[in-house]
Amino acid sequence: HLNVRRQRQMCIRDRPSIAQQLIASDIVKKISITGSSRVGKLILKQAADKVQRVTMELSGHSPFIVFDDADIKKAADMAIAAKFRNNGQVCISPNRFYIHERKKDEFVNLFIEKTKKLKIGDGMDPSTQLGPLTTKKRLNEIEELVEKTKEEGAKVLLGGKRPLSLIHI
């Protein structure tokens, strides 16, 4: 006998009224949110009225740390998997990399080499490893971030521009 729990995952953006209705519903048994602290506080207040179970991951800024005794090939493989899962649009996707000075060059070279091999394309194509971002707004934010960091002195080691063959609709 299998105990299968039904789950529904919804991505709700800019729709407070929908979230309020879902939280108030007797159908919803648990709320899980990944998002900002501001939105988390609002949802927690609404859920408190029903003493609703809530799990939150708020405002994550996950570091990826590589010490001097690390297996660099394994660390690079793990970094690629963590950073590019769902195009980095995951709350636990690393935003900062701290690499021991003695391992930095080797790690960076491996990371670039492995990133070059990732297939960018249509998210519906099973062979695609990097598909589209969730919204055009997010795409613009990332392009602005790249430009800002370059202006502040960052050096782009790979890419830095959207592939011309891909169009965001």
Ranges and model annotations:
Residues 1-12, 167-169:
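Single conserved hydrophobic/aromatic residue that forms the stacking wall/gate
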Residues 4, 24, 45-49:
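Solvent-exposed polar/charged
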Residues 6, 13-17, 67-70:
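ATP-dependent adenylate-forming carboxylate-activation enzymes
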Residues 7, 27-28, 50, 93:
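Short loop/turn motifs at secondary-structure junctions
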Residues 13-29:
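A structured beta-alpha segment of the ubiquitous adenosine-cofactor-binding alpha/beta core
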Residues 30-34:
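Periplasmic-binding protein-like
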Residues 36-167:
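ALDH superfamily catalytic-core signature
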